[in-house]
Regions:
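C-terminal tail/sorting-segment detector
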Residues: 391-393, 404-428
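Non-cytosolic beta-sheet module surface loops
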Residues: 74, 82, 131, 354, ...
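Residue-level detector of functionally pivotal "anchor" positions at catalytic/ligand-binding pockets or at interdomain
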Residues: 335-356, 365-367, 382-384
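Exposed aromatic-hydrophobic patches
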Residues: 396-402
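Short, glycine-anchored, charge-dense loop/turn motifs used at functional sites
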Residues: 376-384, 409
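Short beta-strand/loop motifs in extracellular/secreted proteins, especially
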Residues: 194, 370-373, 409
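Divalent cation-coordinating acidic motifs and surrounding scaffolds
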Residues: 24-337
Length: 428
């Protein structure tokens, strides 16, 4: 191997492996806990052991998943319920490291949102909330406890939790749209496009709903949210989405508390900002990790534990069935804590998709319009393709004919200021 090839192989190895050599992973679980309160609505009949039974089932789920971030809906809006989960479920059997964020309930009501976190990995920084006609939208800014923390260098992630208005009437859809519009306006007012995670029970029936479009097609592309599994459609009662439905775990309900009808809705979501989706500020969503716990694709209009679940143990399937009519949604995040943030922050957002049918697709998120030069290199350092193109501010998708053999390639993208982003592409 000549010197040039050795150099390029070394560069390629650094590009591909360096951000992950010492990467940590944060596992998030989002869960609508279904009335974790004694203030249940009329028609829901509970026994004196109601919360004790819920604690037993939730503890099984927590021990099985072991989340670092646990965001919840439908927790009682008093601190006693927040403390109860922390003390009776999370910090048990020798575990002492779970903490909770501040509770708010300025919108009023008997249920609220909450975020619990593993204090060995994360610390609480600050929070804000948005009042709505239904429930607060809660945002908690967390910092990752990097080895460089004492020198003031860390990674921030803001976890935003909501429980949007339920119902299928036009008025319900309008309220949901108002809620998500309020969030996007708030983020724009803050003025920092950053690492945001937005999760909760969205109560959406379709990706065409205005509430959802407010998130994924917001006018300022730097604040848009991305669905890690990119599954748009009419989710309600559609068998083609059976593997992502999150509600209901029950087909019938003897006590009147659980929604019925079986698994036929995608109500529960974890969405991420472009900075997390593209991994540009040291945090990247591991999109293939996204799943609803217990959703093996065989639950359409059925129950989570009958017939036997193929993705989780029977004990966990039964705990999910007994605890809530929703399934928890799980997503992992890769944290690059190798060097200081400034060293590896990319000057502009780029996502390179592996070539399909001799076409290379590149997606840009740009703060300013400019001319960009795209170059494709082989592993031995030979430039194979070069193309120049002018892109406007915002989101752009560029497709380049890619009639090259199956191999690994290095993609170099540079603007007129000589700011450069280097990616890899694999053609199979």
């Amino acid at each position: 191997m000549n010197l040039t090839k050795k150099i390029w192989c070394t560069i390629f190895a650094l590009i591909v492996l360096l951000p992950y050599l010492h990467a940590d992973t944060i596992k998030m679980m989002q869960y609508n806990m279904m009335y974790y309160t004694t203030a249940v609505p009329s028609g829901c009949t509970v026994t004196s052991s109601y919360l004790n039974d819920k604690d037993i089932n939730l503890k099984k789920i927590i021990k099985y998943v072991q989340p670092d971030i646990f965001s919840v809906n439908e927790i009682g809006s008093q601190s006693t319920y927040v403390d109860r989960i922390k003390n009776n479920v999370l910090n048990t059997d020798g575990v002492t490291y779970y903490q909770n964020c501040p509770l708010t309930n300025f919108s009023g009501g008997s249920i609220a949102n909450m975020v619990y976190y593993d204090s060995r990995k994360l610390g609480f920084h600050s929070f804000f909330y948005i009042t709505t006609t239904v429930r607060d939208i809660n945002a908690y800014k967390m910092y990752y406890k990097t080895p460089q923390l004492l020198s003031g260098d860390t990674i921030f992630i803001t976890f935003i939790v909501t429980h949007l208005k339920a119902g299928s009437y036009d008025s319900d859809q309008t309220t949901r749209a108002q809620q998500t519009a309020a969030l996007m306006t708030k983020l724009q007012q803050i003025g920092v496009a950053d690492n945001y995670v937005f999760s909760g029970d969205f109560n959406l029936y379709s990706s065409s709903e205005t509430a959802y479009q407010n998130l994924i097609n917001y006018s300022n592309t730097l604040y848009r949210f991305y669905d890690p599994i990119n599954q748009p459609g009419n989710w309600n009662n559609a068998s083609q989405f059976a593997n992502i439905h999150t509600q209901s775990t029950h087909t019938s309900s003897s006590g009147g508390c659980f929604s019925t009808g079986g698994m036929d809705d995608r109500f529960d979501f974890i969405l991420v900002s472009p900075y997390i989706y593209f991994g540009s500020k040291k945090v990247k969503s591991v999109n293939e990790s996204y799943h609803a716990l217990g959703q093996d694709g065989n639950r359409y209009n059925g129950e989570i534990n009958n017939p036997a679940n193929t993705s989780i143990p029977d004990s966990i399937a039964n705990a999910l069935y007994n605890f809530s009519d929703h399934l928890p949604v799980i997503l992992e995040f890769a944290i690059d804590n190798t060097v200081s943030i400034a060293d590896f922050e990319e000057p502009f957002l780029v996502q390179v998709y592996n070539p399909i049918e001799n076409m290379l697709t590149i997606e840009f998120q740009l703060n300013e319009a400019d001319q960009y030069t795209l170059e494709v290199y082989s592993m031995d350092g030979k430039r194979l393709l070069m193309h120049k193109n002018y892109f406007e501010t915002g989101n752009s998708v560029f497709k380049l004919p890619f009639e090259l053999p199956a191999s690994l390639y290095i993609i170099k993208i540079q603007n007129s200021k000589k700011q450069t982003v280097v990616k890899k592409a694999i053609k199979f």
